[in-house]
């Protein structure tokens, strides 16, 4: 696994997006790792994976979400559901190195909440990095599983699902069919948004900006409101 990240990566960002993206990336991702002494900000291209798990061809390479997106989206759902928020499990589909789980845990501690947090990641090496980053936080369950092999009971409890463009349309359709409870979808970099909209979802809130990392939508199923 390639763990190198440095000045050349920032130069590439600058060349494509100007100064704005390197600044965002440093404060949203790189500095976060430095302050928390963890490893989440380095992306992992498909060609750099050490192994090819089930449905590897359907997956998208690893990249960390921005801090502000993770915090903003969960706080919006919290505000919408108010006292009912405590009933939801928080589930990151394609949890990678565990950044979303890490920030969720801090958010729950801040608000004195005890929601169950679950991360589902099909790549073993990324799951192992997440485990080290999370340092055995006792309110987080990590599952090294492909979405198709994830037990049905995970999808039978009310949940808030976080997806950072983890896979293509085929797996999204399978995922939608598997959910059997009241839920919200937080979709960061929503490449296949229309697949959700075509399956009876509605947009609760959204945001679009200069880079896909800042694009997100919050969705819910119309007939489960």
Predicted regions: what they are:
Residues 137-147:
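Conserved SAM-binding strand-loop segment of SAM-dependent methyltransferases
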Residues 130:
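Conserved SAM-binding loop
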Residues 94-98:
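Class I SAM-dependent methyltransferase "Motif I" SAM/SAH-binding loop
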Residues 168-219:
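C-terminal substrate-binding/active-site "lid" region of AdoMet-derived donor-dependent transferases
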Residues 146-180:
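Active-site segment flanking the S-adenosylmethionine/decSAM binding pocket
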Residues 99-112:
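Conserved SAM-binding loop of SAM-dependent methyltransferases across substrates and taxa
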Residues 1-82:
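S-adenosyl-L-methionine
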Residues 116-121:
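Conserved SAM-binding motif I beta-strand of class I
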